[in-house]
Amino acid sequence: MRVLITGMSGAGKSALVQELRRRGLRAFDADEDGFSEPRTDGRWGWRTDRVAALLGEQGDGHLFFAGCSEEQATLPFDYRVLLTAPVEVLLERLRTRTSNRYGQSPAEQAQVLADLAEVEPLLRRSADLVLETTEPPERVADVVLRRLAER
């Protein structure tokens, strides 16, 4: 099953990918694994050719792909997980994270808040599972894997 893990910056996508990898599962992060590129408008988008090729690979078990981009609606994911967190948690994670500098400037934080108001409601409508990520990544992974096993 091809599983999309999506959500706003700071929602815990990368942390969940790391936990899934720790468990030996195939998990990819759009921000870290060369699946994203800058667009002409200054934002980042997915290299849909690379993402589609990855999703087309045959393999045993689940394939997890984490990221958030306008292009995600056009790709053949079988299951969509939306990660969310309270605003104050998102902002604190953005201010203190070391793996990715996005979200540390006031302008970027304002963009995340705008996306939270405008984009997250759209993601909720297409999500098969919505999880608040105030729990540790290990617990979030447990819930995701349990729900997938029930399908």
PLM feature spans:
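A glycine- and Lys/Arg-enriched "phosphate-lid" helix/loop adjacent to the NTP-binding pocket
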Residues: Y79-L122, S126-L129, L145-A149
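Structural recognition of the conserved hydrophobic beta-strand(s) that form the central parallel beta-sheet
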Residues: H62-G67
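Short, well-ordered alpha-helix to beta-strand connector turns
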Residues: G24, D60-G61, F77-Y79, S126-A127
